[in-house]
């Protein structure tokens, strides 16, 4: 482990096939429907680039199946790397967090499952406060990596007000509201494959790996252009 003690080790040799193997821990006593972050220190080796999701953290939410940390590939046994994943707690104040090699589903564009070796230590969970830029409207909550917020708080408030209008229009069109009528949540995430701009669910995952987030805010700041494509 980090200080010479024990840690979690998951290993899968290529000759045994790709895997999605994780160590799961159930959490209780969380505030219901609030954003939390799980941290871990990680070392890893021999994980082929873009083969599945590699070494990852994720939670077992049934409202957002695809949420995860960024994916780690290759070999890094010299230093412990920090890894984190954000997730919404369940309505009963619980969550199930997983330290894994490969993902729980194999149906992702990179196959989900992986081979190699990964070590996890110093796993902790905190409620998100200033780790993310957070703002909300009447029907939408926003959780964004601060370095990617290129618009002012006022401009984002106006954007959220427009998203609220779109929410009401969708509700009128469909005759129903998603997720039992609770506010939509939009969460920027590095745990998406390169082919995805965003993924539907609760929360909606908005890829911060490339320019999806920054370009939206740049257009908002420079031209007042606002997008509602995230409400899919």
Where are these regions (language model features)?
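Extracellular and organelle-lumenal recognition/adhesion modules and their flexible linkers in secreted
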Residues: 1-131
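Juxtacatalytic substrate-recognition/specificity segment
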Residues: 136-232
């Amino acid at each position: 482990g980090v200080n010479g003690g024990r840690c979690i080790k998951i290993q899968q040799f290529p000759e045994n096939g790709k895997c999605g193997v994780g160590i799961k821990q159930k959490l209780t006593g969380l505030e219901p429907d609030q954003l939390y972050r799980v941290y871990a220190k990680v070392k890893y080796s021999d994980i082929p680039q873009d083969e599945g999701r590699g070494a990852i953290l994720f939670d077992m939410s049934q409202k957002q199946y695809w949420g995860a940390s960024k994916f780690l590939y290759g070999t890094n046994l010299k230093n412990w790397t920090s890894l984190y994943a954000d997730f919404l707690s369940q309505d009963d104040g619980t969550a199930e967090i997983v330290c894994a090699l490969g993902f729980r589903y194999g149906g992702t564009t990179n196959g989900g499952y992986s081979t190699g070796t990964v070590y996890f230590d110093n796993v902790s969970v905190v409620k998100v406060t200033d780790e993310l830029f957070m703002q909300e409207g009447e029907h939408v909550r926003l959780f964004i990596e601060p370095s990617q917020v290129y618009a002012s708080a006022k401009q984002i408030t106006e954007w959220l007000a427009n998203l609220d209008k779109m929410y009401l229009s969708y509700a009128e069109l469909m005759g129903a509201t998603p997720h039992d009528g609770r506010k939509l949540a939009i969460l920027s995430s590095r745990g998406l494959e390169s082919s995805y701009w965003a993924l539907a669910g609760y929360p909606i995952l908005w890829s911060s790996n490339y320019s999806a987030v920054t370009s939206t805010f740049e257009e908002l700041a420079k031209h007042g252009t606002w997008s509602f494509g995230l409400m899919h």
